């Protein structure tokens, strides 16, 4: 089976090991790459000998094997022992085992090194398969290479006899034994340089800029080994998997500047689409007889999962079943369900359709593959039933019930799945890739890469709409991903994958889009692969101009080409064919079955090929006569330079054109195209005519071939020169005209084109010009069959002219309105658009190219080329001899200056704009008796380009140029093999292929570990295209030497490296190769060392980077500046501007995991991405940052959000032994305080400030001022709005100095009384009345404030530890005491009061450090209300707050005249690399809460621009380890609220739970302030909803935006709060919950919670032990590896320990323990409770009784007043550190989903009635 059509750039793209390939195929591929270097290709063994013999003679030496205790160097080489070899430091030396007869130490069974020296054909097959390394058979593959380094002197002294020593790991790789004899020799670096190196990694997120830095740091200019471990920055780990040299796998190689690294992720996200088309239920007639779905469920998927398990891959899997259902239009019309509501898209048969998507699993760990297969089987049973039932609930909002009939109207069984050919594959792919537009938000720090696999029962051919193809192509190109297609049907006989599409039938009404200069579809995507079946007399010139570039919205239709099929092969789709029999054989081979087929051999075909198409003409031919028969096979246009006849040109008379003189390179695509597409290839070499020489070119030397072709062309084209001025139409017959006539009854011919020919690397096609007169059309000439024995083309027929035809056809075309007509030859058609008025003359440019009036030229029956009617505005209409010629241009056909009078209106404008040709030929046209579209007075003269193919020729319109590189038009029936192997077929992924892939096998390597987009590419436009089709935007960047707050790049080299890194992380690729050399005229770019920034930063050095249609050029100019030039394709800018107001609205029916029915969703499919402001980004990197007010959003920072969730503590745990005197709440606050100390310790300080601080090392960092309060932020803001103090909240700590230097105190020289006076004085500590859980503490201060004061004001206190020690001494002497007399003095949020004997009477609560507004003493004070100097509450807008705040009209009167502004969080620069392991500053923005209720979540958000993600992840892991010691769980959660998940992830949707019994009105809240009796009563309508969430252990995450007072402007440092509903999170972190305005619950699984834990759980033990010490579990802490990890999907159906025994504390519920629960179990328990009216009513009554009973007063307690505040503390404060007395019942719940006891709920709910902060109330609780 030949190679398929373009095996495009799937990032899953690598051919698997050659276990299924033949040895001959592998060898032929290797030879094909070296043919151009030698006339006689050498064999691999000859190359090896030649390679090994380079340098000096071999030397024999003794090899030692050492371990790391001896030396950490991999290879030790004693250079002094080989002085005669002339070895120098830096030389590359190869090691080969020495072989001796009878040497048992080198037996093939034990020593791989000796075995590798044996030839593969000498080895026995048993030895070949007995070792997994047996495929490295030759010395080239198995040799060991190393770079000479100086030998350490100490080792040389201790071991003088050491010659060569390798580590144990290298010895194991190469099979070396200790003290064995080896041969060494010097080799040239170029000979051993690797072409590709596969590098795999897992359990980490790596951006491509880190890959680039890793290669520069660890691999460049070094030797790499298979299996080599790579560690970068101490945390990024990778492994070398494969090394390729000239297409062969080797064990070691030199990583040269031209080596291409291919990074593969073993922890990626996979989206598997299974197309449930009609064929999925068909039986396999040739195999087992099972339906095709069984191939998926029993064959392909189990094989894929097994390979994942064997490779230890840890992917996340999403599986979606999708199909398109076609409905009977009459049945739909007769029903109550209108077709408009059903669908807005009609299929090719013009029947209503609906697309269905069923999400089976979502982000499930690949290790749960048995569960995945079970779910697939369950859904398959009901899938067909569910999509076939049309259930009408409402005509406006249709839903499709999965269970059956509706109550209101009966369900209708209608429709059936479409075939795979007409499926919705493009929509599914676009849908899956849409979430990548938000890839920088909620970044998963464990998985890298997204792979999309589409499994289809078809054969790889799809009918699609042009709009879908263009939109999907644009989206995938911008987002840098590719798709893998796995087909279950046999491979067809043509190129695949193939997309069939029709011409768009609409056009925009604007002139800009009608103009060819600004519009028009890609010619590459419009070439016809079907006969032109319409017999319309003509295509009007006006309609020819009306081209549409998106077809999204238009009312004007133009001449319909909808009956024409066009064929294209996309670059972004790779294809495989699953054959169960093949892999059954491979399994037998792996199991060493004696009856298994022998690998590396060609298995004889057991079945004969049965033709699927019978053609009468072919059957009537003799086999040997077919080359001389009268059937001519025209070529299908397949490139951008091809014009095609429209439907108006059917039935032109036959004619042919002779190809012009051209030079054919050996690997030229012409070589394989000179044959009939229906003829078997082996037959082609049996010809005896002159053409036989052309087909046997490989047997000749290139020089002989070129000489022969030149002579041949001279003879062929000689007669045309004599007739170039002939104008009289005549019936001149083509050469061999009598022999080439065919019957009109069966005119079936196969079309194939060679227009889409790539430029060859070394040889250009020669050219010449031929003028061809165009005679006036005449009536058709009937043709007759003649003797097929005469050749189709003779030199003796040079006096005859070819004729012109308009009709092309091929055997695989679909049905058309007219049967195809056979022609004796391929013909050229000319369509004159003369009817256009002068005013429209400008729009006529490109009309010929648009109309495709010329399809191909045929030199003979089996050779043809194409005439391209290409637009060229800069080339006026004039004789060809005056036409400027530019290299690499497509074929163009020009109209001569002589025109009839009627055509004079065309004289003033270019007839064929944008056409510049290198190889041009003017060809005279013979009789065309059917050109009757418009009368022709004189035949125009044509300029025909026979170029070998600039696929980016300028003949394309701007829109086509934007899409052309990504979808190429080909002749699927016979695409040349060289063209398919051309790297350009692979687009952006061309460098991911060490050797050409095959379509016949499944690419297991790519499916197991998808490749990341390569760092380099060769895709680049031509110089003229770059000048004419791209908009240039230049600007310059220079480092900011005066930047504040962060270290700016100091040199141009550092700045350049950061700018390149930023672009690589955003999907750009560094451009190399000949194309960029031609455009820039810098030959250093042919193969630049992209891994050496020192070479890139030299003055004048240029770097090109590209992404899709955007190109950036970076030039190092004089000084320290870098000049940036952005090239933006004109079409891209047009598309971007147009897409802002236009998008595709897609309305599929989707059923998510827990959804009971299919729901129609309106999804905006936007193919464009938001324009990135690179000027801002580059200047931001350079240190110019003052002009950005919100860089995180403006520059698309990577953003993640974490929350600290307070957990229930078990005080018998070893880790809590040190907190015996602390209650749960205090331990949680200690944890947050400990984190703030870490943040302050690692706060990023620029080097200048650090040097300044080093001189003043006395003072420690102060803790961040986080205001702790026991009510929610909205309650605090509402209650204390009139007490807001207008101070600057930007002060994170106390003033730097309170007392002057001369007045600083000393511990030894101060008395308690004087110290008490100072502390309570104006320069002392803040004394105020503070409320905590409804208990008011008068005249108290906080522990960390006194600690800071002591540190600042005592000369002999240098640390906070000393301050705490001194504070405890003061406390022992009676200066102050804890308000509850429970604690010593601590540096934290502890309340202390001055003892009565030292207390100074104060008339009012005050803050001693800052001036304040006199408070209303009738109102009890709060920590926020009166301690507001450090509060984040401000009366003016902060400079760092978001400026785009939407002002709202206050709904309640405000006592402040101006609208108050409150910032609830702060930000700081944090250094994630304190140990300086990276070569650049690694800084992130850390956002943290300034107001915090210990009962709620504490919010942390991280954002960064160019920081290493692995370092960030390590930092977060260290935070999590610290927090867990204090009962806090650090969990990653989405930034957006749960109800907005479907905006970014289309396959997810919140699960709605409704209360079966409506709750009663909530109790009247109480609030203790002066306004309690004056304000109106505000009921909390969500009181019972919040109580129910607390019952199921949910804690408050964020409040709704509407919860805050309307006259207060609330903001966060990261933006404005925009939550529509309040959001809660389960204590496990696995489920999010929201309460809607209607009183329903929205629940959503948090898929971000468990990625790291799952990876850690699955981590092999040796990897777990290798973790850094700071991330290991310590004594008294909890190791997440040993705990039950969170499940990755609510659909995982894990077996959970639901019925686990009671804990020692007596808690029966899982929720009480710190164990993760599967989200579905939490949801199920919650939904069951909400669906039980009896249990709900009981809950309402109990909650209401508790609420009303606590209104009288505090709940009675038996504890002393010293142990509990006067009002009441929540259970978390008083209960969990006290073990229950013996005999008391354990606090358990009957319901597993109700984790807490009724006793605790009673205490909590009693606080709710008073507006307790534990109530979760989001409204001000007050009596108003």
UniProtKB/Swiss-Prot annotation:
Residues 1321-1396 form the DEP domain. One of its GO terms (cellular component) is GATOR1 complex. One of its GO terms (molecular function) is GTPase activator activity. Residues 646-659, 779-799, 854-864, 947-961, 1809-1824 have a biased composition (Low complexity). GO terms for biological process: intracellular signal transduction; negative regulation of TORC1 signaling; positive regulation of autophagy. The keyword Membrane applies. It is a peripheral membrane protein. Residues 734-762, 1798-1807 have a biased composition (Basic and acidic residues). Its main location: membrane. CDD domains: DEP_DEPDC5-like. PROSITE patterns: DEP (PS50186). Residues 28-41, 815-828, 1444-1460 have a biased composition (Polar residues). Pfam families: DEP, DEPDC5_CTD, IML1, IML1_N_fung. Residues 720-733 have a biased composition (Basic residues). SMART domains: DEP (SM00049). Keywords: Membrane, Vacuole. Belongs to the IML1 family. This is Vacuolar membrane-associated protein iml1. It comes from Aspergillus oryzae (strain ATCC 42149 / RIB 40).
